[in-house]
Amino acid sequence: AGVSSSDGRAGGVVAALSARGLKGVPVSGQDGDAAALNRVALGTQTVSVWKDSRDLGREAATAAVSLAKGQKVAGAKTWAEGAKKVPMEAMFLKAVPVTKDNLDAVIKAGHISKDAACKGVDKAAAPAACK
């Protein structure tokens, strides 16, 4: 399996596996970028963890305004799970693991067009989102 911290790195894993003629190896990434979502549709990447950047932007702006006013950030929680267990305030937004089974979620959200997500996909073996 190839577990990557970003979809860009996952693309490198997919390219390396392809160069070796290896198929069916689970590969994960994060970001929900267009190339990765296309790889999910093609079946060369198993999952991309997506966080809607519009939600991230809204929450970041709201947090910045609260902090500028000297207020606590609504919804922030204390998190101390790092290697040194240093407590800090954090907000965790919903992450969506996008697979071939729910690829339509990012299309319906307007994050990517169906044409871009499904480019080059064989219609006979296509996930439901590409039919």
Language-model segments: residues:
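Electropositive phosphate-/nucleotide-binding environments in soluble metabolic enzymes
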Residues: D7, R54, R58, M91
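Sec-exported extracytoplasmic/periplasmic mature domains
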Residues: V14-L22, A41-Q45, T62-K69
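Structural signal for conserved beta-strand scaffold positions within catalytic alpha/beta enzyme cores
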Residues: G29, V49-W50, T99
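Hydrophobic alpha-helical
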Residues: A1-R39
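Hinge/cleft segment of the Venus flytrap/periplasmic-binding protein
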Residues: A63-K131
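Short beta-strand elements at the ligand-binding edges of bilobed clamshell
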Residues: L42-R54
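Hydrophobic alpha-helical segments within soluble ligand-binding/sensing domains
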Residues: D33-A36, D52-K72, A76
